[in-house]
């Protein structure tokens, strides 16, 4: 039986968000498999589950096309090292977790060697560069999607796919109670709090930090009672943000915390965030939000003409309509963002928005880790029988 068989499962997570997803899947797979080795590239959460990382996850961290071009030689060498390892010692299955440009190239090579390949977290082919769906069809045996519209897209293009839901929707309660958390951060129940999330990578903070600091400055002038809390993903990013803060905004009363972005959003009245997973978390926490994002000039010039969706914020994409204000590139300016944040801070009734957030939450709450593990086990059983 597969449960007792010695198995080797290779995985690559290129970012910390993928590390969290990978850890959940490993944890669930260990409930079903008694003799299994997990190896590849993972972060601290995967390592806690017994994962053996051949490369430090930070070596894969890139943002934007210019960063990819600059780092390409290093990324190429890492990919070739992994492929050599798995050619000599083939895994029973390879699972690429997000990080599509890197992982799809690995998957394509491994599949040619008759190694089963699974991609967890759909590349945003439904949003831009849709022709990639043909590469995905050749490279993977199964795509595990976090959102229902992604599964529908793949099935329309003849790609094997399964919607598993989102692990965050399982983790966060439908009706979260966050009032007790305010005491932890020395806030009172009647304080007005704006959580500001400029990003979790150097490149993101480089572009979003100054913009969001200027927005906070404007809000502090117009609403002096508003408190600001800024979670910074890790200690390595502190110098980047504090350099921006001390340059012009030292007088602002901002509580900067390490990590705990979810708690910062949970205790807030409104969230200001860059696009990405944080918008999903804010929605699951039922927090009104404003979303903004800016690329570098080169990245924007290449990507913008290829974008095929009307929204960038996940709540808007999932709803199929504009639930929350979002601003991209030149529209992501201080005036527009400040006005939207103030409107939300001044609004006393968000019941309809919260109801729509709750409906989406229920759709995404599917016990994702278990569904992913069972899908992986089916692939393994098919390949080993």
From Swiss-Prot:
GO CC, any one term: membrane
The protein's annotated pathway: Bacterial outer membrane biogenesis; LPS lipid A biosynthesis
One MF annotation (Gene Ontology) recorded for this entry: lipid-A-disaccharide synthase activity
Keyword DNA-binding: no
One of the GO biological process terms: lipid A biosynthetic process
Keywords: Glycosyltransferase, Lipid A biosynthesis, Lipid biosynthesis, Lipid metabolism, Transferase
Reactions performed catalytically: a lipid X + a UDP-2-N,3-O-bis[(3R)-3-hydroxyacyl]-alpha-D-glucosamine = a lipid A disaccharide + UDP + H(+)
Keyword Glycosyltransferase part of the UniProt annotation: yes
EC number of the protein: 2.4.1.182
Domain of life the protein comes from: Bacteria
HAMAP family in the cross-refs: LpxB
Free-text function comment from the UniProt entry: Condensation of UDP-2,3-diacylglucosamine and 2,3-diacylglucosamine-1-phosphate to form lipid A disaccharide, a precursor of lipid A, a phosphorylated glycolipid that anchors the lipopolysaccharide to the outer membrane of the cell.
Family to which this protein belongs: Belongs to the LpxB family.
Protein name as annotated: Lipid-A-disaccharide synthase 2
UniProt organism field: Legionella pneumophila (strain Paris)
Gene that this sequence comes from: lpxB2
